[in-house]
């Protein structure tokens, strides 16, 4: 990504190739040199025309915080699962003391444990391990709080119009901004944005039946963000609930309705991103 920034700063047009041509891979196999050659050919012959993200503004700063937040969240979940496992398999006294505690209380209780050096070796080691994991969770909670605060400030500065949309929170807006990049004008059209988010309808018709299916490609974080917006609106927005009811009566499945709604939301978001 540093190379792309350097070339863009020098006035060189940088084309982004998301993935190698699958047909070429089937014929020639997979290797880094072959993928590089195929990417160069795709950019040279115009088959791929996506302009690379500039990665030099607020959105790139947001992306770095999102990476750190995702890592901290995953580490917290992992530590919590390890605490539950150790407390379940540990000595009876610890298991009884920690059973049924809520997550926050569990972290506090384990972080406050005092291992006794003269105790039986398994009990002592288990207390040390639980205390270590409990303190790790509390430290990660502080990290997440600091990251959330800074992330909220950056998202509000980068796209206040996005936060005003019904169903859009800081994390959702951050995912959509990262997908678009610091230079959303690189997106050729609203349809290109929908394809990037994995909500472009794909034909799945057969015979006289005309239908579409979900797109499994695209940016999965942006796709998940659109899904969260739709879920919020299906629960709290009267227009969306009326639409779902009408479509259900027409025979549409819930999955199809969600796909259509995600496409509508993608169109709404694109207009906000392209005209801040």
Report residues per predicted region.
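A detector of single, family-specific signature residues
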Residues: 1-276
């Amino acid at each position: 990504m540093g190379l792309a920034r350097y070339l863009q700063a020098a006035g060189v047009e940088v084309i982004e190739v998301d993935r190698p041509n699958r047909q070429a891979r089937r014929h020639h196999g997979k290797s880094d040199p072959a993928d590089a050659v195929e990417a160069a050919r795709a950019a040279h012959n115009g088959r791929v025309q996506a302009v690379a993200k500039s990665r030099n503004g607020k959105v790139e700063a947001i992306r770095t915080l999102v990476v750190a937040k995702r890592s901290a969240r995953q580490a917290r979940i992992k530590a919590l699962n390890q605490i539950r496992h150790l407390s379940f398999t540990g000595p009876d006294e610890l298991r009884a003391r920690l059973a049924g505690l809520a997550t926050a209380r569990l972290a506090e209780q384990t972080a406050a444990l005092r291992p006794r050096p003269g105790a039986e070796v398994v009990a002592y080691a288990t207390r040390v391990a639980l205390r270590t994991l409990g303190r790790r969770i509390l430290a990660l909670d502080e990290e997440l709080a600091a990251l959330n605060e800074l992330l909220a400030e950056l998202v509000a500065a980068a796209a206040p119009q996005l936060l005003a949309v019904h169903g859009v929170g800081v994390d959702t807006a951050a995912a959509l901004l990262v997908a678009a990049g610091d230079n959303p004008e690189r997106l050729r059209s609203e349809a290109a944005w929908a394809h990037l988010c994995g909500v472009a309808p794909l034909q799945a018709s057969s015979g006289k039946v005309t239908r579409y299916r979900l797109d499994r490609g695209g940016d999965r974080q942006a796709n998940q963000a659109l899904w969260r917006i739709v879920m919020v609106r299906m629960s709290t927005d009267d227009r969306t609930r009326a639409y779902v009811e009408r479509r259900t009566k027409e025979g549409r499945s819930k999955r199809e309705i969600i796909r259509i709604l995600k496409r509508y939301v993608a169109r709404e978001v694109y207009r906000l991103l392209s005209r801040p």
